[in-house]
Regions:
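Residues within the helices of the helix-turn-helix
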Residues: 23, 28
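Alpha-helical structural segments
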Residues: 4, 8-15, 19-20, 33, ...
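Append "Primarily bacterial transcriptional regulators
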Residues: 29-33, 41
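Base-recognition residues in the alpha-helical recognition helix of bacterial helix-turn-helix
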Residues: 38-46
Length: 61
């Protein structure tokens, strides 16, 4: 998937964290919020920890 889709997933993850907190963060919820096909976020970030690390790295850029 293009980098734009990955960025859309990260934006959706940040929005989800802000709106509902870290306990609400899941790959499926990020996919849904970003309007991506199921499994997209898992493809880029295999674990929840990797997803959180990706968010931190993306924000730091």
């Amino acid at each position: 998937m293009p980098a734009a889709s990955r960025e859309r997933a990260l934006e959706a993850a940040v929005e989800l964290l802000g709106a509902e907190g870290v306990r609400a963060l899941s790959h499926a919820r990020v996919d849904e919020r970003a309007a991506l096909p199921p499994g997209s976020t898992s493809n880029w970030f295999r674990t929840r920890r990797a997803l959180l690390g990706g968010i931190v790295d993306w924000i730091a850029e």
